[in-house]
């Protein structure tokens, strides 16, 4: 179903890997009049936007907001009021630390119809890509999703006493710069210093990096690893299962960046295969195949009955030759 005029779609774009974007999300992007996106979405998703679509970067980084939340809210209301089909793209799921609830409330108050399109949340998919199940029958029967980012006035600090007493898994969003503070807070609240911890950077993407340790050691390990955001912190005994279940980072081409220079029409299948093997693929076509008028080719094709062997130096030659053969 295409995006409808005058409606705002709050769309989750998944944790970063293009393959984890839902079909509904792609469909809405492809029919949007206005597209407002955050920085954590897969860049390739923007290529689905149609010609003439207003594409607006509303990306937020720590201490560097392209647009304030109030400005984003105003954009959504204004664009929809003009009868435009508006897609608001967010990393992960819009209702899991995505401020989708705030934007939905603003739209409701303004009388603007909206729909929520759920996405794959990073809180579950990113640990999975690091070989860490957030629940396990013999290890953890519950998971708690927490934001490690406090408000400007210092409010919103995690309830370390409650988390320290939990025997389940704790997943903390937006905490890379606060790893030491989180670890110290949990230990001060009584959590064992040996409690396993993982920090996963750029999860589900070919640039994923994972550091594991304990509450006591994780701060130094993260500093030494020079991890970058976005990153998740996973605390709990399930982290130890990574030794058995680390599948994503064990693929044969993981950690390798490969540039594919084939013509665009032919590059996608190769690029997909390389990505399935774990590679970070950059498609950079350096050639373009164009048909030429070659009246003599048909004569050559007809004369091949007396030929013992045909040698083709590229797929393009095969396509051109047999196209002429079928036409004769």
Task: Report residues per predicted region.
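Class I S-adenosyl-L-methionine
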Residues: 1-18, 23-120, 125, 224, ...
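Conserved anion/nucleotide-ligand pocket segment
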Residues: 150-198
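Short gly/pro/ser/thr-enriched loop/turn and capping motifs at secondary-structure boundaries
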Residues: 43-44, 62-64, 121-125, 142-145, ...
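Phosphate-coordination loops involved in phosphoryl transfer and adenosine-cofactor binding
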Residues: 5, 83, 167, 254-256
